[in-house]
């Protein structure tokens, strides 16, 4: 990963952008705790609504992220499972009801968003950049059920979208 260039954005220097072969309109970032409004043990850029942080601070932090990435981040309630959510277009739905550990979208203006601490963020994009996905891969999700983990699940959904004509180009 490389640090984001200040000329590219006003993101904190501690945020990292992967160096991966995707079209220029596909962006990914790994945030740090720098740049937000939360205080105390959640300071400063806490994006998680599942902790005892002040809800208004979490919403303000999510607004900081949305402004920085220029897209609507969709957050899931991650449960260390294998379910994959297909995200709607920006503004079509809230994110509080989405229970999944991976998401995929063909919608412009939507940011597939996963939160990780000791788990892995896995990002996918096809070569045209018309299908993108993100997975929260912890050991339970990687192990899965009956031989199918979160990575197999997200890849199946991702591949189906690309194959069905919603996206063009080969899968990376």
Indicate where each model-derived feature is located.
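Active-site microenvironment for binding and transforming phosphate-containing groups
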Residues: 1-172
